[in-house]
């Protein structure tokens, strides 16, 4: 899980992340590597970058083809926006349109099949973009 320091708005987020960090540290100390939920895949090395109104995205790197929880915050409030996952300009996933606020740490479950699709495209970076949409 790496070294992590960022502000959470809920104690639940702090607890969950600290438990994950502790499990990863224990696995690493026992020689099992840093991955706890999935085995690191030597062929999987994806950088995660924010775009649109997303200020940042965590984790910044994905090393396993497994369901991965992405956390992010938006830079400004918006009533209608959509989370999109892009690889080399191609949209791999689009979420439902909904409201976002900068004060809320958002999370997004990135399915393993989306990670695999990015790897199949031969990219080393995916983009988590939160894009405002015009309501009709």
Go through the PLM ranges and name each one.
Residues 1-136:
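Residues forming the flavin
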